[in-house]
Every structure is written in structure tokens, then in C-alpha cells.
Design a protein with these regions (language model features):
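N-terminal activation segment of mature serine protease catalytic domains
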Residues: 10-61
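Cleft-lining beta-strand/loop regions that shape enzyme active-site pockets
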Residues: 14-21, 33-42, 95-98, 103-112, ...
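PDZ/PDZ-like peptide-tail recognition elements
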Residues: 48, 60-98
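Conserved P-loop NTPase
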Residues: 306-309, 315-352
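Glycine-rich phosphate/pyrophosphate-binding loop
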Residues: 354, 360-370
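Single conserved hydrophobic/aromatic residue that forms the stacking wall/gate
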Residues: 371-381
Length: 381
């Protein structure tokens, strides 16, 4: 999940880079300018260096060009032109975390865990997610050819996907049985919390609600505040999630609004390996608060918060600044939410669990055992 902040105005910590390290950078920069097989401008090299610093930190930190930033805004609003996939890394290549419901990716048969080896003949090895987005996005109706590696397949194969407008409602609901409702949340957009509220109120208008199944399988997350708003439908106030990081600005608590809509009504939350980020926030909160039974398979394990820091009028840094914690103090980073009831094949589609990509599989995944949250400091990140 990403939030937009202004750069802090506090005095930054002293730079400890040695002369030798700076000289290494300068020598490398000069060697590339002089000897690389193709001409590369100084501006291009500096941009590559910034990208490299960020992408080497973890899978979610990134350098955002104007197009990247526009893409980020589009994804939170719920409409963009592309393939309809959430991506990460596996083995140095771009991989599909989950395809979005109703997207061209679903129509083309792409699956969670598929590794994208090439995009229109260009290898994705070492390619950043921002670069891959540039290759995969394009005008509606145009096509892109992906070379796919899939578990269980002996050879890579090509999949042709026709780009389309991804404008899928994030919330759908239907009555399963007399008074028992399924609410399917495919991603967390700005209005998703309010959409769930509307779905519940609509169900109540039809009669008694005896139980709710909240389905966040294959939901990659999105806007954190939407998950907090959504939790307010099932909790009568109290803590939903809190965040901690190195900087005081990263220490925040998020509470549900009082006045839940379904007091005493049983709730089941369905999760699987494609449930990430905001999906894990609501599942973890309802689990810790004793408000729902979590059912399915272990979730993805993305427990980090990214802050968008503008560095110019058109460019920004997306930097991992904190981890989020469930009401009982659990960090799910690389661990995921473990269901109360494990149902191995409780899946939205016929995906095999073994093909799933999880946060722990992503390159430079933040290992919880290596993270030390120090005493709050007044220095910016």
C-alpha cells in the first residue's frame, strides 16, 4: 500500500559515505560513459543509479517517473488500460502475483505464479516493475505477447493478451442461501470500504442477515484506509492496525468507527496465497479481535507500507517506510495470515497452491528476523 507524503524538512543525518565509495561510483560512472557499447547520457545514468538504489532495497521501493506516478494513481482509482495483473519478482524475472478479476489477463488464461520471461521478445530478467509496466501498458485493443514459464510445464510458451480498460468494480455481493451473504472484494480502491457498507445495507433491506462470507482471495491489496473503513462494518470501534518504522511520522494507529452494521452476525473471511497487504489487514484485525473465522490457505505476507515522496513536479520515490501490525502486535511481513481453518483448495479459481508467489519468494524480501525497529528518531529516512 502506498501513501503520499511531503519530504520531511528536518535535518537529515550526516552522510557517512567514504571518499573511496564515492570514488567507486565516479569511476563506474566514467567507465560506462567511455566504454559502454551504446551512447548513454549522463541524465540516463543518474536515473539508472537512483532506480538501482531503490529496487535493491526491497521489491516494493521504486523510482516513479511521471508515467509511473500516473499509473499508481490510476490503480487506486480503479481504472486503467493494460493487462490486469499484479506483479512481483521470482528468480530475477517478473512474475504474476495475481490476475485481476474480469481482466484481459484472466481471459488470456494467465495464472498467479506464472513467470513472465519475455515481453514482446524482450527479456524481463533484471527488469524493474516500472519498466515492465511501460512494456505491458498501451492503447486499448492493442496486443502484447508474453513468454510464460509455469510450474508443471516443461517448456515456456507464448500468451497473446489484448490490452483493455481495467474498470472492474472492487466489490460484488450475492445471497448464497436464506440470509447468508457472500461479499467478494477483488482489490482495495478508494471507495471499496463504502461499497461494502452499501452491500451490507442492501442485504439488510432484503431481510435478516444470518451470516457473511467476506472473500478476499486473490486480492492484492491497495488503499489501506479502505481496509480500515471496511473493518468498521464488522467492529464497534477499536484498533484495526498500527504501523511502525524508523521515523516518528511512520508511527500511526488506525481505528474502526463505532457502530458496526452486523453486531453478533457470524463472519467468515476467505484468504489464500494471493491475499496481500490491505486484505491481510482486515483479516488480521477481525482474527485478532475475535470477530471472524479466517478460512483458506496462508496469505501472501506483505506487511510493509510504502510512502510516495515527490522529488520534482513529475517524479517521485516510492519508499518502504514502515511495517504494519495487527491489533495483537503481529507483523505479517513475509509470514502472512495463518487461517483458523485451513482449507487447501479454498480457491477462487483452479489455481494450484504450489504455483503461488508469496512475499517471502520476492527478491530482497524484508526478512522479519533482520529488521530492528529502533527507538523513534527525529532524523528523516
Amino acid at each position: 500500500m502506498a501513501q503520499t507524503n511531503k519530504p520531511t524538512e528536518e535535518e537529515p543525518p550526516a552522510v557517512s559515505t567514504s571518499f573511496e565509495e564515492l570514488q567507486l561510483f565516479a569511476d563506474t560512472f566514467d567507465a560506462i560513459r567511455r566504454g559502454y557499447v551504446e551512447d548513454v547520457t549522463d541524465a540516463e545514468l543518474f536515473e539508472m543509479a537512483v532506480k538501482g538504489m531503490l529496487t535493491s532495497l526491497d521489491p516494493h521501493s521504486a523510482y516513479l517517473t511521471d508515467d509511473d506516478y500516473e499509473n499508481l494513481q490510476e490503480s487506486t482509482e480503479g481504472q486503467f488500460t493494460g493487462l490486469g495483473i499484479e506483479i512481483g519478482y521470482r528468480g530475477g524475472f517478473i512474475a504474476i502475483v495475481t490476475p485481476i478479476d474480469g481482466s484481459p489477463a484472466i481471459d488470456a488464461g494467465l495464472k498467479a505464479g506464472d513467470v513472465i520471461l519475455k515481453i514482446d521478445g524482450t527479456s524481463t530478467q533484471g527488469m524493474s516493475t516500472s519498466e515492465s509496466s511501460t512494456y505491458m501498458r498501451g492503447p486499448e485493443g492493442t496486443t502484447v505477447t508474453l513468454e510464460i514459464g509455469r510450474a508443471g510445464e516443461s517448456q515456456p510458451f507464448d500468451v497473446v493478451v489484448t490490452r483493455g480498460v481495467i474498470d472492474v468494480p472492487s466489490v460484488r455481493s450475492r445471497e448464497l442461501d436464506d440470509g447468508y451473504w457472500l461479499i467478494r472484494v477483488s482489490r482495495f480502491q478508494r471507495d471499496s470500504g463504502r461499497e461494502v457498507t452499501s452491500a451490507i445495507k442492501s442485504a439488510l433491506e432484503k431481510g435478516d442477515v444470518n451470516g457473511v462470507v467476506l472473500d478476499v482471495r486473490n486480492n492484492p491489496g491497495g488503499v489501506m484506509n479502505a481496509s480500515v473503513e471496511m473493518a468498521s462494518n464488522f467492529l464497534d470501534g477499536g484498533l484495526v492496525v498500527y504501523t511502525k518504522g524508523r521515523h516518528p511520522d511512520s508511527m500511526n494507529t488506525y481505528n474502526a468507527e463505532p457502530g458496526e452494521l452486523l453486531p453478533g452476525v457470524p463472519v467468515v473471511v476467505l484468504v489464500n496465497g494471493g491475499s496481500a497487504s490491505a486484505s491481510e489487514i482486515i483479516a488480521g484485525a477481525l482474527q485478532d479481535r475475535g470477530r471472524a473465522v479466517i478460512m483458506g490457505t496462508q496469505s501472501f505476507g506483505k506487511g510493509s507500507v510504502q510512502t510516495v515522496l515527490p522529488v520534482s513536479d513529475t517524479k517521485a520515490l516510492k519508499l518502504t517506510t514502515s511495517l504494519y501490525y495487527t491489533p495483537n502486535g503481529r507483523s505479517i511481513q513475509a509470514e502472512g495470515i495463518v487461517p483458523d481453518v485451513v482449507v487447501e483448495r479454498a480457491q477462487l479459481t483452479s489455481l494450484e497452491q504450489g504455483n503461488r508467489l508469496r512475499e517471502a519468494d520476492l527478491n530482497r524480501s524484508i526478512e522479519l528476523s533482520l529488521i530492528h525497529i529502533s527507538e523513534p528518531t527525529r532524523h528523516p529516512l
